[in-house]
């Protein structure tokens, strides 16, 4: 599954799948951290979310900063680049339970 972010880089997206790709809105990269929520009915509060950068000229630090039933939050920033681009973030949900 894929989804493209609208409006700005803090606009949330909805993608109901255990893996997929999120295309960020076109904007200049920034070293200042920004966050957005991914609404996803496949996510449980105990799951683990894996992220990696699929594309983009700039390099991005990608963090999952919250996981809840039905959503997770991505916080990101560039490592210093300011290219205007639409980077793509791949994600995967690892189904887990708290031990």
Question: Positions of the model-derived regions?
Answer:
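Extracellular receptor-binding modules and their adjoining Ser/Thr/Gly/Asp/Asn-rich linkers
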Residues: 1-47, 54, 60, 66-99
């Amino acid at each position: 599954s894929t989804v493209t972010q609208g409006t700005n880089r803090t606009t949330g997206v909805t993608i109901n799948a255990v893996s997929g790709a999120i295309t960020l809105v076109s904007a200049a990269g920034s070293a200042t951290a920004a966050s957005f929520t991914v609404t996803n009915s496949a996510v449980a509060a105990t799951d683990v979310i894996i992220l990696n950068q699929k594309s983009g000229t700039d390099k991005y630090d990608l963090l999952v900063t919250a996981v809840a039933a039905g959503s997770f939050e991505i916080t990101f920033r560039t490592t210093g680049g300011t290219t205007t681009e639409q980077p793509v973030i791949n994600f995967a949900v690892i189904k887990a339970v708290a031990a």
